[in-house]
UniProtKB/Swiss-Prot annotation:
NCBIfam families: hemC
Descriptive protein name: Porphobilinogen deaminase
Catalyzed reactions: 4 porphobilinogen + H2O = hydroxymethylbilane + 4 NH4(+)
Cofactor note: Binds 1 dipyrromethane group covalently.
Keyword Membrane annotated: no
Recorded name of the encoding gene: hemC
Record-listed E.C. numbers: 2.5.1.61
GO biological process, one term: protoporphyrinogen IX biosynthetic process
InterPro entries listed in its UniProt record: HemC, Porphobilin_deaminase_cofac_BS, Porphobilin_deaminase_N, Porphobilinogen_deaminase_C, Porphobilinogen_deaminase_C_sf
Subunit note: Monomer.
């Protein structure tokens, strides 16, 4: 039996509300008569907009207040962009669903110029260190400009901040109907996405069996396996938003292939590798690939990144 009423905790940003409303619609279609309410919660990440994420604590910034509301029993579930979800959950809470992945690629937005046509020294707006590292690896002459804010704000900054291009996740643009502003989609081999990019995660109290059962139909097994492998890699590397780590899993039949990448922020030092195996071993594959990357030079790169952070 599905619960009669469910409260979804969500940030008030356009994209977060789209994600929460999508979940609400899916639940209402599945369980006629169910009451689904959205509860808007302001998070630290919404309040601090003038500082790069890396400097203010990275990943957990967009989920902490929502998780606290869940633990207090004020909401029943939360819908997150998987790329914002830390690898550790507070006691009593957990990820119960990973939805089918939207387009995982990075979108390149410019005034009709493709990445390969960018002028020497072009200024690129992005918030993610992994994007900066991968683009600088390909084009060391580029100037990276850190931009924050919601999707519309970032698109506006292209003109306002006199940038040559901005880079955003394609999934968010697709969900909000901004596909027409995209100049090109960057291949996942060229710009490996963030951990979990394009997938949504549903989190709830682990003792709330009725809610867990009601949400189960939204889980997409292939995406869940791929994202579990990506997150296992991230967890082993102890990386948050503030570290240039990327991973992308794809599933074909029962086989999961995972590509992983660790870099220095300037893109000068990079390690990259891939691993394949059974989807049943997703977490093991992610951990094993992380160990390989760390042994191949990733550990030294990350130690250097952390040292620089401490020096700041």
């Amino acid at each position: 039996m599905a619960p009669k009423r469910l409260r979804i905790g969500t940030r008030a940003s356009q994209l977060a509300l789209w994600q929460a409303n999508w979940t609400k619609s899916e639940l209402e279609a599945r369980y006629p008569g169910i009451q689904v309410e959205l509860v808007k919660i302001k998070t630290m990440g919404d309040k601090i907009l003038d500082v790069p994420l890396a400097q203010v604590g990275g990943k957990g910034l967009f989920v902490k207040e929502i998780e606290e509301a869940m633990l207090r029993g004020e909401i029943d579930l939360a819908v997150h962009s998987m790329k914002d979800v830390p690898t550790e959950f507070p006691e009593g809470l957990g990820l119960v669903v990973t939805t089918k992945r939207e387009d995982p690629r990075d979108a390149f937005i410019s005034d009709k110029v493709t990445f390969s046509e960018l002028r020497q020294g072009a200024r690129i707006g992005t918030s993610a260190l992994r994007r900066q590292a991968q683009l600088l690896k390909a084009r060391p002459d580029l100037e990276m400009v850190i931009i924050r804010g919601n999707v519309e704000t970032r698109i506006r900054k292209l003109k306002e901040d006199n940038l040559d291009a901005v880079i955003l996740a394609a999934a968010g643009l697709n969900r909000l109907g901004f596909t027409d502003v995209v100049t090109e989609l960057l291949d996942t081999d060229f710009s490996i996405p963030a951990i979990g990019q394009g997938a949504l995660g549903l989190e709830c109290r682990l003792d709330d069996n009725a809610t867990i059962e009601a949400l189960a139909f939204l889980n997409h097994a292939d995406t869940a396996a791929a994202v579990a492998a990506e997150r296992a890699l991230l967890k082993r590397c102890e990386g948050g938003c503030q570290v240039p780590i990327a991973a992308h899993g794809t599933v074909s039949g029962d086989t999961l292939t995972l590509v992983g990448f660790i870099a220095s922020v300037d893109g000068k030092q990079t390690v990259r590798d891939r691993i394949s195996g059974s989807t049943a071993d997703a977490v093991k594959l992610g951990t094993e690939l992380a160990d390989r990357l760390l042994a191949a030079g990733g550990k030294a790169i990350l130690e250097d990144v952390y040292q620089r952070e401490i020096a700041h």
